[in-house]
């Protein structure tokens, strides 16, 4: 597949971002593109909006490569001529890149027999509610169980030509956070007859600021971010309800449990103080991304030998990724791919360099071609 074809495919994906488990147009574009490849050694199956392609290799050992598919509920502001056609949705996390790179790899190995069997996993719903865990729990792969698994994620902060990863912990444990307050509304002139949830909510927000500072080991890392606060309907009406939305991120599961326990204790105290009811919903939870140390070291060593590739020793990040569920099931590696964008992930102006697509494909073709069973 030529670079012009890859760029065309990436831009086609970019125009049709779809949210989790609704990637119907995306799935069709994937299947249409795959149908034009050499079919001799391919086996294809689907599950919901996911696509799985097995490539027959010479040795009875299977290496999986995963690419996520979904977009984000963000209104695009890139100014691209190929900007999103779906109002309020955008590929702002590079999943259009991820799929295009996977297709480039698949196209190569469809016509060049790989050393090992390859399994390409095009996974929906990474941004939520999560697609990796349901695929594993439903045993969708069946007999196509991989012995190793790999994936990449674009990094706007790294220059094109850079690849970064590390053995062990790479990304954090994450949890969504939705908190609903229920009190009693009333007239602003008669606060004694009401139960103000804006005030209760404000006290909760203030107390949450002590959770990490006074409950998490300073040598560990955790963050609680409350990104949405909503309450009230009119300036002279006391709010009967309020809502907070946020996220929890920790580098250890033990710290995640501590944070959740403290949030629930604070909620119980606010309930007693303000005679209200508080409901906490943790939404989607993603486990940490933990790279197999031996495989990560081998991938790093290979990357350092490649002309045109600058290998960077990555640091642990508070990023969340449901690829961690695959890594709990199968040994593997996730790595960062430099795309040199002036704007970051989840930014409405994200503009990754398309030059990185060809670099990633060339690198992973070489890696997978040289890969031997462990």
Swiss-Prot record:
<dbReference type="Pfam" id="PF01546">
    <property type="entry name" value="Peptidase_M20"/>
</dbReference>
<dbReference type="Pfam" id="PF07687">
    <property type="entry name" value="M20_dimer"/>
</dbReference>
<feature type="active site">
    <location>
        <position position="68"/>
    </location>
</feature>
<dbReference type="InterPro" id="IPR011650">
    <property type="entry name" value="Peptidase_M20_dimer"/>
</dbReference>
<dbReference type="InterPro" id="IPR023905">
    <property type="entry name" value="AcetylDAP_deacetylase"/>
</dbReference>
<dbReference type="InterPro" id="IPR002933">
    <property type="entry name" value="Peptidase_M20"/>
</dbReference>
<keyword id="KW-0220">Diaminopimelate biosynthesis</keyword>
<comment type="function">
    <text>Catalyzes the conversion of N-acetyl-diaminopimelate to diaminopimelate and acetate.</text>
</comment>
<comment type="pathway">
    <text>Amino-acid biosynthesis; L-lysine biosynthesis via DAP pathway; LL-2,6-diaminopimelate from (S)-tetrahydrodipicolinate (acetylase route): step 3/3.</text>
</comment>
<dbReference type="GO" id="GO:0019877">
    <property type="term" value="P:diaminopimelate biosynthetic process"/>
</dbReference>
<dbReference type="GO" id="GO:0050118">
    <property type="term" value="F:N-acetyldiaminopimelate deacetylase activity"/>
</dbReference>
<keyword id="KW-0457">Lysine biosynthesis</keyword>
<feature type="active site" description="Proton acceptor">
    <location>
        <position position="127"/>
    </location>
</feature>
<dbReference type="InterPro" id="IPR017439">
    <property type="entry name" value="Amidohydrolase"/>
</dbReference>
<protein>
    <recommendedName>
        <fullName>N-acetyldiaminopimelate deacetylase</fullName>
        <ecNumber>3.5.1.47</ecNumber>
    </recommendedName>
</protein>
<keyword id="KW-0028">Amino-acid biosynthesis</keyword>
<dbReference type="GO" id="GO:0009089">
    <property type="term" value="P:lysine biosynthetic process via diaminopimelate"/>
</dbReference>
<keyword id="KW-0378">Hydrolase</keyword>
<dbReference type="InterPro" id="IPR036264">
    <property type="entry name" value="Bact_exopeptidase_dim_dom"/>
</dbReference>
<comment type="similarity">
    <text>Belongs to the peptidase M20A family. N-acetyldiaminopimelate deacetylase subfamily.</text>
</comment>
């Amino acid at each position: 597949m030529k670079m012009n074809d890859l760029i065309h495919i990436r831009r086609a994906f970019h125009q049709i971002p779809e949210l989790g488990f609704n990637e119907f147009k995306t799935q069709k574009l994937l299947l249409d593109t795959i149908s034009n490849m050499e079919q001799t050694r391919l086996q294809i199956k689907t599950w919901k909006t996911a696509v799985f392609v097995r490539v027959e290799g010479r040795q009875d050992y299977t290496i999986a490569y995963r690419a996520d598919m979904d977009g984000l509920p963000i209104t695009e502001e890139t100014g691209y001529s190929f900007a999103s056609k779906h109002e309020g949705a955008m590929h702002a996390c590079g999943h259009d890149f991820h799929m295009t790179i996977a297709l480039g790899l698949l196209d190569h190995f469809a016509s060049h027999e790989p050393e090992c069997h390859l399994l390409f996993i095009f996974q929906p719903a990474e941004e939520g509610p999560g697609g990796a865990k349901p695929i594993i729990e439903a045993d969708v792969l069946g007999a196509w169980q991989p012995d190793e698994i790999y994936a990449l994620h674009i990094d706007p902060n790294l220059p094109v030509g850079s690849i970064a990863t590390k053995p062990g912990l790479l990304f954090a444990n994450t949890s969504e956070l939705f908190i609903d307050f229920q009190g009693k509304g009333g007239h602003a002139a008669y606060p004694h007859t009401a139960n103000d949830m804006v005030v209760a909510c404000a006290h909760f927000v203030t107390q949450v600021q002590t959770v990490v500072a006074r409950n998490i080991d300073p040598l560990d890392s955790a963050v609680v971010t409350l990104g949405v606060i909503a309450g009230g309907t009119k300036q002279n009406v006391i709010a009967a309800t309020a809502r907070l939305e946020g996220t929890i991120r920790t580098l250890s599961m033990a710290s995640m449990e501590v944070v959740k326990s403290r949030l629930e204790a604070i909620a119980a105290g606010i309930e007693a103080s303000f005679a209200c009811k508080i409901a906490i919903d943790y939404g989607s939870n993603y486990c940490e991304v933990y790279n197999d140390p031996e495989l990560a070291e081998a991938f790093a060593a290979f990357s350092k030998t490649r002309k045109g590739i600058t290998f960077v020793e990555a640091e642990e990040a508070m990023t969340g990724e449901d690829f961690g569920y695959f890594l709990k099931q199968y040994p593997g590696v996730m790595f960062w791919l430099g795309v040199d964008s002036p704007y970051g992930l989840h930014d409405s102006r994200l503009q990754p360099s398309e030059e990185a697509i060809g670099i990633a494909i060339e690198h992973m073709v070489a890696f997978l071609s040289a890969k031997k069973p462990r």
